[in-house]
Amino acid sequence: MRIEEDLKLGFKDVLIRPKRSTLKSRSDVELERQFTFKYSGQTWSGVPIIAANMDTVGTFEMAQALAGFDILTAVHKHYTVEEWAAFINTASADVLKHVMVSTGTSDADFEKTVQILALNPALNFVCIDVANGYSEHFVQFVAKAREAWPTKTICAGNVVTGEMCEELILSGADIVKVGIGPGSVCTTRVKTGVGYPQLSAVIECADAAHGLGGMIVSDGGCTMPGDVAKAFGGGADFVMLGGMLAGHEESGGSVVEENGEKFMLFYGMSSESAMNRHVGGVAKYRAAEGKTVKLPLRGPVGNTARDILGGLRSACTYVGASRLKELTKRTTFIRVQEQENRIFNSL
């Protein structure tokens, strides 16, 4: 046993220090980025935000809506091959360019993903997702996926430390998904005591990944547009959002009514709700590591997407970054004990 003495930080622990700017308007900021990925060789351009691969966020409907904003969607792994085929038959090439195919690490998951990718060559992204990316089995699966799909861009996670980020990149991942426990409906940290404050994880993993020519996506911990800006400022190439995109018409959650008001269910993918729905319940040897919440219906996701992108543009203007690409270089974080004046937050 040992204790690391250096303090690790989350998004709530910092603010971005403003700097002189020559920008005249938020409209001058370019949020689109262009990436060429280490192994696939694919070049992609768009806004590097990803809707999370949760079945109450990463739906086909979400992909259709967010493609209009140049945003990616990691479509959840619980759609059947037949449902994928129906979606592909109606989706435009531009929508498919903004879709990631999610998979687990079982043999059945692999075979299903093979079938889905064979439906259309425009499906260029694979998101290999497990809660704990530290297992040898997971690393071996990433290597297997790279061998099977040499021209696909592979995103793999989740991890939170530089050395594991490096191992996944060396095993074939183009992008490493970073985050253990920061999600709004994740309870891993309280159930297990395991985790890592998200901003520090992003900073450390970005440094490790970029040294090898890889990239990272910050997954979890964002509660507002300012957190998205902080994730990019900390070095994230992509930012994945779950709770911020939940509760919308396109989110796919079940709608319930209480006292005449309608709510949408949103749950973590290791929650009892998710396991009851997809694997017949919580196995005797494990505990649920997620919760279920009821969110007031939030209407079309487009309004939220515009708010997030607007906040991101504004953050760039405050530090003089004319392009999102410049935000990291122009970010100085300051440690704080307050974020906002909360006097009217309860109203």
Curated annotation (Swiss-Prot):
Binding site residues for K(+): 181, 183
Gene encoding the protein: guaC
Enzyme Commission number(s): 1.7.1.7
Keyword NADP in annotation: yes
EC top class, as a word: oxidoreductase
Catalysed reactions, as listed in the record: IMP + NH4(+) + NADP(+) = GMP + NADPH + 2 H(+)
Assembly: Homotetramer.
InterPro entries in the cross-refs: Aldolase_TIM, GMP_reductase, GMPR, IMP_DH/GMP_Rdtase_CS, IMP_DH_GMPRt
Protein name in the entry: GMP reductase
Record's function text: Catalyzes the irreversible NADPH-dependent deamination of GMP to IMP. It functions in the conversion of nucleobase, nucleoside and nucleotide derivatives of G to A nucleotides, and in maintaining the intracellular balance of A and G nucleotides.
GO biological process: purine nucleotide metabolic process
GO molecular function annotation: GMP reductase activity; metal ion binding
Keywords: Metal-binding, NADP, Oxidoreductase, Potassium
SUPFAM superfamilies: Inosine monophosphate dehydrogenase (IMPDH)
Active site: 186 (thioimidate intermediate)
Binding residues annotated for NADP(+), in chain numbering: 108-131, 216-239
